[in-house]
Amino acid sequence: MTLRGLFALAAPQSVGGQAVIEGVMMRAKDKLAIAVRKSDGEIVTEVRPWFSLVVHPWLKKPFLRGFPVLMETMVNGIKALNFSAVQAAEDDEDDTELTSWHLILTMVLALAAALGLFVVLPHFLSVGMEFLGLGGDVDSLSFHIWDGVIKMAVFVGYILAISYIPDIRRVFEYHGAEHKVIWTWEEGKELSPESTRFYSRLHPRCGTAFMLFVLVVSITLFAILVPYLLTFYSPENFIVKHLYIVGMKLFLMIPVSNIAYEMIKFAGKHSKSLFCKIMSWPGMMMQVLTTKEPDDSQIEVAIAALQCAVNAEEC
């Protein structure tokens, strides 16, 4: 799954998107469009306003905007996924979209799962390495090296595991279609399967790259700040100490996401520079796992989503 709406520039021609179930969501400025292929082959489209949390000027400042933009992208993404699930279902008469409370619960569960997998689990596995004599205490470099290695292993392992699920593979194919269509749009070419299929399924502003930046920034920031902050206060009880550190790490994910957002904005804006190409390369390689080659029917859906996003009044 991508968060390109997170990284779209302010220019009118900038677009972003995400793959959904049997479809694609695209964002252009303050509108989003969802296109879904129904079981009978029909492409259903819907245009909606982009829900934004960045309503105050100070939330638009660099190194403050990343976290609220991430949250609003999650809200819009979950809504788009729910719409696509309803439309793609064989029998959608009994299916309804999420209520506000269901949306909040879904977001809380999604955040809890992500933080559990990529913050809490690596921390306590690193504690296990200390018990096995393979690493040091939390204020040592070896602890944070293990923490980083485990985070990366969990991330790659998770992507590899879900890629074997047929429905997820279909989402990855639509992810590839989304990237190809955005490349075609950015190059000013005709939006058709024939002109689009030859473009790369990898894109430097992909949400996969953002997730990788989050991991790298969190590893670096935790290694520096956690030992330093423990000099001010460190609980004596072993369990309380590590629960305190995990809580500290969870709070630090806010500045981590802010920094990662600025990094990917910079990389996207200067994508032709050698430095940014090197910086973006790991994220591009991860997209080999999170995207698959789409067929023409999937490209058609991505084109429909983009056309509705940029010409909302015609859909």
Positions of the model-derived regions?
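Hydrophobic alpha-helical segments characteristic of transmembrane helices
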Residues: 87-133, 139-164
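Alpha-helical transmembrane segments of polytopic integral membrane proteins
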Residues: 77-80, 84, 118-122, 126, ...
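Transmembrane alpha-helical segments and their cytosolic interface motifs
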Residues: 100-116, 199-224
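Divalent-cation
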Residues: 1-85, 89
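Low-complexity, intrinsically disordered, cysteine-poor segments enriched in small/polar
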Residues: 66-73, 77-80, 84, 184, ...
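Alpha-helical transmembrane segments
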Residues: 241-264
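Polar-ligand-bearing catalytic/cofactor-coordination segments
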Residues: 4-16, 20, 24-26, 40, ...
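Juxtamembrane "helix exit" motif at the C-terminal ends of alpha-helical transmembrane segments
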Residues: 83-87, 111-136, 214-245
